[in-house]
Amino acid sequence: MPLGYWGVMGNCFRRLSLFGQPTQANYEMLCSSDDLESEELTYFLDMTYKDFGVYQNDIISHQKDTETMKTLLGLLPMYKKTKLRHTIMERCLSNCPNHVKDALCVELMKAEKILQTMDVVFMKTLIGEFSMCTDNLNQLLNKFATDQSTLSDVEKINSLIEIDGENSKRLLVELDPILHEETGLYQALPNVVTEAPSEKVKSIHVESEGESVWSSVTEGGIMKQEKGTGV
């Protein structure tokens, strides 16, 4: 080990001063680059989202989820780079010549769009998206859907969950293709669809008081119901 360094229990310490009698107080523990990146990410998320009610303890609890942290760590450099560009352009806008101002405004709007989109990505990656298992939904319907009003309400909730997921993906897809070329945002996000979702219809069958009820819900939230006599 080089002079001025010593190791104990798998940790590496560096001596702060080569003068005087060495004691434990003269050393600092070295951290790996991964630890520093994780600390930087935690600080960034805490400073950015604490006003929304996402606190440091909430962020730290996600550190055990390696895939979530890996995604967030991959997005952070892109966010910082775009934020720096946005700050510089915003500062230059008031003093730049008129023949430059229009082009600068376009670039500024691009940066704002990227930052807004990444805010959504960070937040949804951090807190997770709400979802409901189809089996659980069917159990709820069979247990509680004693009338058409309840059936309609539950189906609308499920439809809204699906629409929210599609809108989140569409938000990324609708970014200007130039932004994608500049940032590689799509590659940084796994499982992002690149086509607008087609209209889907889901049907759930519930029997209540001798009646057979079929309820269909489109992604637009339109309810279609048919009744028939149970066999």
Curated annotation (Swiss-Prot):
Superkingdom: Viruses
GO annotation, cellular component aspect: host cell Golgi apparatus; viral tegument
Post-translation changes: Phosphorylated. Palmitoylation is necessary for Golgi localization.
Localization per record: Virion tegument; Host cytoplasm; Host Golgi apparatus
Lipidation (S-palmitoyl cysteine): C12
UniProt xrefs under Pfam families: Herpes_U44 (PF04533)
InterPro entries found in the cross-reference section: Herpes_U44
Subunit-structure text: Oligomerizes. Interacts with U75; this interaction mediates U75 incorporation to virions.
Stated role: Plays several roles during the time course of infection, including egress of virus particles from the perinuclear space and secondary envelopment of cytoplasmic capsids that bud into specific trans-Golgi network (TGN)-derived membranes.
Protein name: Tegument protein UL51 homolog
